[in-house]
Amino acid sequence: MFIGEYQHSLDSKNRMIVPAKLREDLGEMFVITKGLDGCIYAYTINEWRILENKLKTLPLTNKDARAFVRFFFSGACIVDLDKQGRGLIPQNLKEYAGIEKDIVSIGVLSRVEIWSREKWINYNESDIDYDLIAEKMNDLGI
């Protein structure tokens, strides 16, 4: 399970130093892809396989299902960390997430989200009504 918030930067070669705590759970090789809300999702190889198997069951006849699978898989790539715990974020994902240098990685249960620091600050300053969200979660039995 991934938890916590970590602030760090890309180096001159677009490599992210994965924080030690996240590296322990992500492993030396993991998958990153376009996430929702303008961030990048990172999954362990095992968690990616589970997700992949779930998405395989979506009906090809459903337009929204096809669109989501295309969105999710077209940006996916495997990150292989070097001995210093650095991994390359490809240009297309950097552009998608608006990442220039400063990033924030957050643990969100089964995945890590990688945000540009600016987008993360803006997200946290937005008018999110957490009390209303909590009520909706209660309606779902959570």
UniProtKB/Swiss-Prot annotation:
The keyword Electron transport does not apply. GO terms for cellular component: cytoplasm; nucleoid. Residues 5-47, 76-119 form the SpoVT-AbrB domain. Its main location: cytoplasm. One of its GO terms (biological process) is negative regulation of DNA-templated transcription initiation. It comes from the Bacteria. PROSITE patterns: SPOVT_ABRB. NCBIfam families: division/cell wall cluster transcriptional repressor MraZ (TIGR00242). This is Transcriptional regulator MraZ. The gene is mraZ.
